[in-house]
């Protein structure tokens, strides 16, 4: 018997895509034939032949190795202006039919599980009749709800989300809590477990916060500060795990941090790089693990940096990508801190880690048993 599972979340940025990817991979690892669909998407990528697909559908196609067919894996895109266009002429946008036809391609003869990934919070899409709850109902799927780590606010958000699914007659079969600080895991498991037990909903997993899932690529940082690449563009996909400013280099423990972003004013860069080398030597390191340099307060820092032999030797020897930004160091730090890091096709290590986290912290056997033993 085929099972349709709809992965919803109480909010954006809770980790829905990460958990969905982990569940798909974990089911596959158990020998099941798994199909994936993002019925309603908002952020899309352009493909060949003037086609578009949700960016998450592209991620899953590459990670799970299937041919991306937008009309099947990403049937509806609600981009800018879509909702206004819909209400100007609803008959021209048969969204429901597109979703139903997409799901029909996942026949029981070919797929044991169909995993449908939701969009945003449960109410997203309501303006065109495609809330997460409505889509789950029309596709005949049952819901697993992903919630943020917490107690009071998390329970409030769950209650609001569950009300919408109940209104549509859709059953929520379990809850997975994501991004929980390690020292809060048992407390959250205890209290959320009590509440969910009273509601008759299983707690299927508590996934700890994993810092590596939040590491941005240097290219994402460049975009956030509207920077320009000065040197070594081929290394712009270095991952960034920590940040140090030039003024704090001498107090920074380089031994406990890898993939460091150095943020420094262009004029002070030669002096700061010498300090980096000195600190590394004092701390017993053969070389500092600098993954990128952001030169601040700079509109055309290339001549200034290129004219300094020490800077160029450091950049070339350690193959460090360098960008510049007009922002000052404080302004750049604010922009970087505001980055919302998403799993994508350029971060394959995150896809692998997502699978590990789900396999380790989600009771997948319980999830399977629920779907196999309880009638749809």
Regions found by a protein language model. Give the residues of each.
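Flexible phosphate-sensing "switch/lid" loops adjacent to ATP/NTP-binding sites
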Residues: 2-376
């Amino acid at each position: 018997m085929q099972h349709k599972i709809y992965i919803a979340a109480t909010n954006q940025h809770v980790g829905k895509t990460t958990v969905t990817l982990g569940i798909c991979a974990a089911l596959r690892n158990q020998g099941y034939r798994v199909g994936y669909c993002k019925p309603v998407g908002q952020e899309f990528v352009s493909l060949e032949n003037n086609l578009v697909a949700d960016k998450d559908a592209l991620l899953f196609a590459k990670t799970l190795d299937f041919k991306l067919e937008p009309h099947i894996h990403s049937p509806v895109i609600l981009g800018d202006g879509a909702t206004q266009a819909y209400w100007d002429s609803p008959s021209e946008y048969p969204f429901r039919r597109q979703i139903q036809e997409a799901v029909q391609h996942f026949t029981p003869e070919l797929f044991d599980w169909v995993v449908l990934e939701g969009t945003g919070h449960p109410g997203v899409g309501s303006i065109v009749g495609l809330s997460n709850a409505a889509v789950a109902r029309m596709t005949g799927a049952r819901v697993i709800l992903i919630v943020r780590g917490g107690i009071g606010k998390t329970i409030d958000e769950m209650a609001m989300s569950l009300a919408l699914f109940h209104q549509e007659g859709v059953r929520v079969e379990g809850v997975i809590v994501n991004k929980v600080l390690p020292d809060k895991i048992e407390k959250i498991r205890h209290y959320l477990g009590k509440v969910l037990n009273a509601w008759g909903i299983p707690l299927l997993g508590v996934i700890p916060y994993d810092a590596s899932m939040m590491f941005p690529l240097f290219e994402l940082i460049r975009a956030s500060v509207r920077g320009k690449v000065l040197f070594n563009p081929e290394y712009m996909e270095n991952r960034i795990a920590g940040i140090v400013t030039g003024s704090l280099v001498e107090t920074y423990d380089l031994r406990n941090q890898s993939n460091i972003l150095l943020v420094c004013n262009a004029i002070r860069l030669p002096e700061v790089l010498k300090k980096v080398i000195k600190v590394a030597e004092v701390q017993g390191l053969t070389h500092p693990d600098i993954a990128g340099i952001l030169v601040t307060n700079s509109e055309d820092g290339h001549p200034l940096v290129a004219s300094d032999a020490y800077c160029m030797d450091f950049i070339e020897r350690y193959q460090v990508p360098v960008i510049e930004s007009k922002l000052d160091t404080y302004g750049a730090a604010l922009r970087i801190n505001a980055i919302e890091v998403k799993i994508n096709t350029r971060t394959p290590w995150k896809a692998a880690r997502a699978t590990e986290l789900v396999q380790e912290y989600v009771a997948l056997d319980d999830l399977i048993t629920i779907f196999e033993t309880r009638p749809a």
